[in-house]
Swiss-Prot record:
This is Snaclec rhinocetin subunit alpha. Pfam families: Lectin_C. Residues 34-151 form the C-type lectin domain. Expressed by the venom gland. It comes from Bitis rhinoceros (West African gaboon viper). InterPro entries: C-type_lectin-like, C-type_lectin-like/link_sf, CTDL_fold, Snaclec.
């Protein structure tokens, strides 16, 4: 009987740890949920354009990650930092500038507006800066290869 109680409590602990939070409910396996969007870091080195294409090919409605406010910036930085524990690389996000001289020409690849800017210097493609724990943005050459973060909206 004591052995049965131990096993049943063990199963209860396993069940609670797997279902307790429901934190990533609605996201595909391996994706993380934050504020109605799913995110996944890919440790695959691609140019900005190829990373965006890769994200779009994952499923409908996916793009490189958009970061419209500080809370989301912190979430994405933590997601990347957990994946890159020993190595440091810049990481692509979905911000691109069409005209390097005009700030208002920036856009997120998912079409959302740019209301939160954290750019160190200006160029066409933007990534997360490895030297700040991925908490600030850095202008990068679009043809360079870096890992990246994809984002998708939750299905309705």
């Amino acid at each position: 009987m004591g052995r049965f109680i131990f096993l049943s409590s063990g199963w209860l602990v396993v069940f609670l740890s797997l279902s307790g939070t429901g934190a990533d409910e609605g996201c595909l396996p391996g994706w993380s949920l934050y504020e109605g969007h799913c995110y996944k870091f890919f440790f695959i080195f691609k140019t900005w354009e190829n990373a965006e294409k890769f994200c779009q090919e994952q499923s409908n409605g996916k793009n490189l990650a958009s970061i419209e406010w500080l809370g989301k910036a912190n979430f994405v930085a933590e997601l990347v930092s957990q994946a890159l524990t020993k190595t440091k690389y810049h990481v692509w996000i979905g911000l691109r500038r069409e005209d390097e001289k005009q700030q208002c020409s920036s856009f997120w690849t998912d079409g959302s507006s740019v209301s939160y800017e954290n750019v160190i210097r200006y160029t066409k493609c933007v990534g997360l800066n490895k030297n700040t724990g991925h908490r600030t943005w850095i202008a990068l050459h679009c043809g360079d290869n870096y890992p990246f973060v994809c984002m998708s909206r939750l299905p309705h």
